């Protein structure tokens, strides 16, 4: 009989550097975001099979906008999730759920599903996040090294080098016990909406990172 995902997999906190190969070469964004918490998905006998990272959002306005200024320090973003395609169905949902449960209580987590990449956020829907609508499409300053636009040189002219930022579905999750979740939920500034429907388009994630990494303590 085939083992269940919890029997085969374990989720363990990992140092940020252990995610870098996955994020730079396997995730479509091809860059390393702010990382405050990082988790590895380990399969018995098969090593590291995925990484999930959380960090402070690039925009301070986003932190204030979710639940107000008094709660802005509690806002973190699930900014990267990568799982090998060879993993069983529903592995990503299991990974996200276990990672969320391992975070400190009382945090406000936001994450985005990029409509331009054909994503609707099924993993967030299956792990009971709140859907709060889609961001507006906009353009940002394009930086040649693929770093975030907040790192641009203010002394240079970027008027001809702007990049389209496609609309993204926005999801919010509250960590902790019922009281902590209730306190943060009442401060949510966005209306909770029905989950969007549709099919998810896959991107090329064929790169094979080092899966034999182990956690050093």
Where are these regions (language model features)?
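Acyl-donor binding region in acyl/amide transferases
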Residues: 10-14, 55-163, 173
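Extracellular structured ligand-interaction cores
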Residues: 36-38, 126, 168-170
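Short, cationic low-complexity segments
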Residues: 183-217
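Short amphipathic alpha-helix that is part of the acyltransferase structural core
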Residues: 1-34
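A conserved mid-domain beta-alpha-beta active-site/ligand-binding segment of alpha/beta enzyme cores
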Residues: 158-185
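Conserved beta-hairpin
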Residues: 23, 36-56
């Amino acid at each position: 009989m085939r083992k269940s995902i919890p029997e085969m997999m374990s989720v363990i906190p990992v140092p940020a550097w252990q995610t870098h190969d996955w994020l730079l070469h396997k995730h479509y964004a091809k860059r390393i975001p702010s990382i405050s918490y990082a988790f590895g998905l380990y399969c018995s006998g098969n090593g590291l099979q995925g990484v999930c990272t959380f960090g402070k959002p690039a925009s301070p306005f986003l932190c204030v906008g979710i639940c107000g200024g008094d709660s802005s320090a509690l806002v973190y973003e699930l900014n990267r999730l990568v799982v090998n395609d060879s993993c069983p169905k529903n592995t990503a949902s299991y990974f996200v759920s276990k990672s969320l449960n391992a975070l400190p209580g009382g945090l406000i987590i936001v994450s985005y599903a990029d409509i331009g990449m054909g994503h609707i956020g099924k993993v967030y829907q299956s792990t009971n996040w709140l859907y709060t609508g889609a961001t507006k499409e906009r353009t940002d300053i394009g930086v040649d090294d693929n770093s975030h636009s907040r790192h641009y040189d203010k002394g240079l002219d970027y008027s001809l080098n702007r990049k389209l930022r496609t609309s993204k579905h926005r999801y919010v999750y509250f960590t902790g016990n019922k009281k902590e979740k209730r306190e943060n939920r009442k401060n949510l500034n966005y209306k909770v909406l029905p989950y969007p429907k549709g099919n998810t388009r896959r991107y090329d994630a064929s790169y094979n990172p080092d899966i034999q990494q182990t956690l050093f303590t």
